[in-house]
Amino acid sequence: MMLNITDLKKEVESVITSSALTHEQAMIRLSDIPLNRVEFFETTKEFRELCEAGCLCRMSEGNVTYQPRYILPDYEKLFREGCKFLRLDPPKTLFEAIQTLEIFYRHVPSVTHYPVYLGSVDKLLEPFMDDEHAYELIRSFLIFLDRSIPDSYCHMNLGPEATRAGEMIVEIETELKNAIPSITLLYDPDITPDDFAEKCVLCALNCAKPSFANHKEYKKLYDGPYGIASCYNALPVSGGAFTLSRIVLSRLAERAKDSEHFIQNLLPHAARELCGYIENKIEFLVEKSHFFKTNFLVQEGFVKVENFTGMFGLVGMNECVNLLMEKEGKEGRYGYSEEADQLAMQILEKLQACVNEFDSKYCDCTDHHFSLHAQVGIDSDYEISPGVRIAIGSELPLHEHLQHCGKFHPYFKSGVGDIFPFDATAERNPDAILDLIKGGFSQGMRYFSTYSSDCDVIRITGYLVKKSDIAKLDEGIAVPQANATWGYYEVKNSKIYERKVRSL
């Protein structure tokens, strides 16, 4: 047990007295407090020590979960068959299709208590696009999402084909400039027309979405279809991720004598401890909690337990490599030295091997192994770069940076990405940015995000927040978007506003 009444009272009081939280945000935070205070299964002394030192991290899930962290329902099944639990028939009109989605989303849980995957909405709506009121209905739908799912981890997918619905969504989002929902274009240059892709680039420059996912590579990952959920997590549709925990490489490196000690001793030990913890959480979720026994999503086949995996996240590669190089008296730095980059690859190869040595009772869709994930960070991270990104302030020239991404992105089956803001003049050359994306993807890059230096909506690490909302929070004024508070602290701690702005 980890219950301390005095600390518990302080934590509750800090929530209920905060003027920067809405009622719903306060309610959700209060509901999470007990799960962070009580253990439901035994953890090892070694695991607890590594957590207390900040080398391992539970990722705000608490010590137990009662629903999967990321859920990607089969929305096509919903449109084919309807839903008995929610008394929804298969939609026959665009109005019914949108209403069906709006109702269904309300009942899809996640770690944030909001849906993190909205489906390939363009494909879902395309059969109904002959409706003469299509523009008004879709515009109203997008406004509904922004106002009723106040969390930009909710993620819509488009493409790879161009559709009337997809074109309209991009047009309206360019106009609305909302932070919610996040959007990804599943991009394949052999399928996606350049004119549609360029419209997506222009939309991104105006409101930081859509991002571009390398569909040609991602579609190879799973036996069935995949989706991009939450930040940029590539996961199976009709499944998702049971849980996500992470290793903080930079903090672990502080304990190392040198790179050999780090790779051969510290890293395997920490990986084993984290894998054991992830497995314990999955077993509790599947075998003891109610979700996989009684939830309608499971009972009606919208998700299946065999399509879920466990995510093994990492952060701080940049700082880890630089610290190990310093300890060995070497001048090379991550991104700027072949020796430093080779060390990073050795770390990833070793970590992948350690994770693959652990056999999970579940995680059928990833051969009973956990999936490596380049985690984007949390709001309390300080001088810890997301995943394998080069630190803000140390960015490479653009083409070299894209090549660097291409070397490291392929290690991460369940998600990785990089962010490249451009100056305002880039809107005159969307074709040039599209060429950069094509080039990066041909080099192995998996996920590309951009926004314009002068737009209000920006990508923090993997999610979207309005700069104007951050300014309000700075004055203690509540804003509707729940994860804007995380963006506020990441701006303070992670130099988000100092990210290198590119020119064409």
Over which residues does each language-model region extend?
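Short secondary-structure subsegments characteristic of cysteine-rich extracellular domains
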Residues: 331-354
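A conserved active-site cap/scaffold subdomain adjacent to cofactor or substrate pockets
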Residues: 267-271, 313-316, 321, 325
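Conserved catalytic cores of very large enzyme subunits
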Residues: 2-306, 327, 333-337, 356-504
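Conserved phosphate/anionic-ligand binding catalytic regions in large, soluble enzymes, centered on
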Residues: 116, 304-320
